Swiss-Prot record:
One of its GO terms (molecular function) is ubiquitin protein ligase activity. A zinc finger (C2HC RNF-type) spans 98-117. It comes from Rattus norvegicus. Pathway: Protein modification; protein ubiquitination. This is E3 ubiquitin-protein ligase RNF166. It is an enzyme of class 2 (transferase). GO terms for cellular component: cytoplasm. It is found in: Cytoplasm. E3 ubiquitin-protein ligase that promotes the ubiquitination of different substrates. In turn, participates in different biological processes including interferon production or autophagy. Plays a role in the activation of RNA virus-induced interferon-beta production by promoting the ubiquitination of TRAF3 and TRAF6. Also plays a role in the early recruitment of autophagy adapters to bacteria. Mediates 'Lys-29' and 'Lys-33'-linked ubiquitination of SQSTM1 leading to xenophagic targeting of bacteria and inhibition of their replication.
Amino acid sequence: MAMFRSLVASAQQRQPPAGPAGGDSGLEAQFSCPICLEVYHRPVAIGSCGHTFCGECLQPCLQVPSPLCPLCRLPFDPKKVDKATHVEKQLSSYKAPCRGCNKKVTLAKMRAHISSCLKVQEQMANCPKFVPVVPTSQPIPSNIPNRSTFACPYCGARNLDQQELVKHCVESHRSDPNRVVCPICSAMPWGDPSYKSANFLQHLLHRHKFSYDTFVDYSIDEEAAFQAALALSLSEN
């Protein structure tokens, strides 16, 4: 755990300030949770440092004896975590284009819109197909995406399982500033193969510290899958 925390700390950057600066292209990034890197959902703020997260994303931190802020790693009092009402108001005020159809939607409704957008669903249909990691005599289904191995989005190194991808990116691309598509997320039913993470390494360390393939029912939505996998992975530790 100590090693994981040190890797997370080394990958973190300052949380960008909320506001409309930067136009539509940067609006989602300014209102993105530093843990899941998606638009805030039921945002909460830590009283001591002021950093904001989705309520669900911060929950695991609140269940440990001495919680640390996931962004700055400073200790905080879990009783002094409150709803970020000012952020919620801004989410309802600002609009940004959908990644699929480019329709402008308020940030508060962006997640719901993306889950039903036909253009996004078309993009999801083009995700990588399943390839067995070893030769097999069994027939290979044609409609199962590859969720076993991934290619590095920075250098193209292939056939990396999830743990190998995390290790490879931490060791080889720690300082790479490029925005890239998460190959793990894009292989999921809810993934967007065209969405580039503003801080991929931070996303990788926070969002993919356990295997979806081990814990997830792929028929449920992304947030339910993440919470179920996180709970099950913690119960095995």
